Amino acid sequence: MIRKAFVMQVNPDAHEEYQRRHNPIWPELEAVLKSHGAHNYAIYLDKARNLLFATVEIESEERWNAVASTDVCQRWWKYMTDVMPANPDNSPVSSELQEVFYLP
């Protein structure tokens, strides 16, 4: 399993709405994530900095990257553009983090 972590931003006035939209996420999005090998996906909110910290375990980079081209992911990204900064393709602005420590 490959562990990944990344950060995103959420708009200051959208914390509650961001949480509402994720509880629960769309069933079809959950199915796509799972079918593409995502496990133990979690997102944490730092309200003071409007920061989202996400972790996920994936089976392969290729399958994880393929999620972005699915119709449901494209619709989800568009749905989320009013609550967080987005790239021109509507994907959330994010930065991948480098793992520096792991205790199994």
From Swiss-Prot:
<keyword id="KW-0119">Carbohydrate metabolism</keyword>
<feature type="binding site">
    <location>
        <begin position="76"/>
        <end position="77"/>
    </location>
    <ligand>
        <name>substrate</name>
    </ligand>
</feature>
<dbReference type="GO" id="GO:0062192">
    <property type="term" value="F:L-rhamnose mutarotase activity"/>
</dbReference>
<feature type="binding site">
    <location>
        <position position="18"/>
    </location>
    <ligand>
        <name>substrate</name>
    </ligand>
</feature>
<protein>
    <recommendedName>
        <fullName>L-rhamnose mutarotase</fullName>
        <ecNumber>5.1.3.32</ecNumber>
    </recommendedName>
</protein>
<dbReference type="InterPro" id="IPR011008">
    <property type="entry name" value="Dimeric_a/b-barrel"/>
</dbReference>
<comment type="subunit">
    <text>Homodimer.</text>
</comment>
<feature type="active site" description="Proton donor">
    <location>
        <position position="22"/>
    </location>
</feature>
<feature type="binding site">
    <location>
        <position position="41"/>
    </location>
    <ligand>
        <name>substrate</name>
    </ligand>
</feature>
<keyword id="KW-0963">Cytoplasm</keyword>
<dbReference type="InterPro" id="IPR008000">
    <property type="entry name" value="Rham/fucose_mutarotase"/>
</dbReference>
<dbReference type="Pfam" id="PF05336">
    <property type="entry name" value="rhaM"/>
</dbReference>
<comment type="function">
    <text>Involved in the anomeric conversion of L-rhamnose.</text>
</comment>
<dbReference type="InterPro" id="IPR013448">
    <property type="entry name" value="L-rhamnose_mutarotase"/>
</dbReference>
<dbReference type="GO" id="GO:0019301">
    <property type="term" value="P:rhamnose catabolic process"/>
</dbReference>
<comment type="similarity">
    <text>Belongs to the rhamnose mutarotase family.</text>
</comment>
<comment type="pathway">
    <text>Carbohydrate metabolism; L-rhamnose metabolism.</text>
</comment>
<dbReference type="GO" id="GO:0005737">
    <property type="term" value="C:cytoplasm"/>
</dbReference>
<keyword id="KW-0684">Rhamnose metabolism</keyword>
<keyword id="KW-0413">Isomerase</keyword>
